[in-house]
Amino acid sequence: MQLSRAEFDARYAAGTLRIAFVGMSNIGKSYTVMRLATKYDFNLIEVDKLIWENLGHDSMDAFAEWQGHPYTDGYSEREAHSISLETAATRKALSTDQRNPMVDTTGSVIYTDEDVLEMLRRDYYVVYIEAMADHIERLKVQYFKQPKPLVWAGHYEKLEGKTETESILECYPKLLKSRADMYAKLADITLPSTMILNPKVKIDAIYEALKPAV
């Protein structure tokens, strides 16, 4: 949803500003929306939480363990089920009537049903946190330290002469690259991860940066 800076501010004051954040997991998205919702007049809706609560899990770690890695038995079926759950949870989140909703979407929101993506484009000001080159390696390491549910969408393959772990680390940057264009097509504004993850950047500066330029 394209907005002018004046429209952004007017909607915020009226309580009708709808913002959604998109981007890869482990890039500071959830931390940033939490900071914004704490400092400003936003109601935070976490789609991840809606999903794992629906599955009866009590944490993201439990959800990640359930989904597993793409080389584990039954992953394709769990991936398809996960996308179905994400579609339903995202649709529910976007349909909220709360004041100034700020929706923290899943990293795989781009694979949800078309009607959900249309809701995002039509009804929400979409902020994309782009993973910059300096953070790609960190994302790979962090993914294995704390694996979040991740839809591979056919981008994983077992590489000749590589272990499963080595293969997934090789394929992960390709997955990030394939997703980048899809996130960008949804976005109304893009913020670099170098800004989001810089501890010297105050939340006020991030809030001003995500507003329309004019």
How does the language model describe each region?
Residues G23:
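The Walker A (P-loop) glycine that initiates the GxxxxGKT/S ATP-binding motif of P-loop NTPases
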Residues S30:
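Walker A/P-loop
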Residues K49-E118:
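ATP-dependent small-molecule kinase phosphotransfer cores
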Residues R122-R179:
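A glycine- and Lys/Arg-enriched "phosphate-lid" helix/loop adjacent to the NTP-binding pocket
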Residues M1-G15, R35, K39, E166, ...:
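NTP-dependent small-molecule kinase module
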Residues T38-V47:
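Post-Walker A helix-loop "phosphate-sensing" segment adjacent to the P-loop in P-loop NTPases
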Residues N26:
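Walker A (P-loop) phosphate-binding loop of P-loop NTPases
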Residues A14-I19, Q98-R99:
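Pre-Walker A (Motif I) flank of P-loop NTPase domains
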